[in-house]
Amino acid sequence: MEIINQTIALMDETAAVKALSALAQAQRLRAFRALVAAGSDGLTPGVISEQLGVTPSALSFHLKELSHSGLVNAEARGRNLIYRASFDHMTALLGYLTAHCCQGQACEASSLAQCLDC
């Protein structure tokens, strides 16, 4: 429980708004979901562009927005960039939303493991 509380503490209102704003656009949400599905292997921009049917220049803009929000990390691997979802940031955002969703009263949050279609 302490680890969860520490993760939630990493998220404040400003960071939550930034992350939610980044996800409040269809192409960025699709790109983020593709990166979540890819897991720790991540994806190159070319693969994401092909999967989503988005031009490379448009995707570059969207990945930059996701990176600035903290939801996505990029790593140079040779001549390629590998993008990965930041699961720590995503968990902190979900924890922040859950912790503040019931106006200070206990609320029942279902397990994330139950969200198989996400």
State the predicted function of each range:
Residues 10, 14-55, 77-89:
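N-terminal helix-turn-helix DNA-binding core of bacterial DNA-binding proteins
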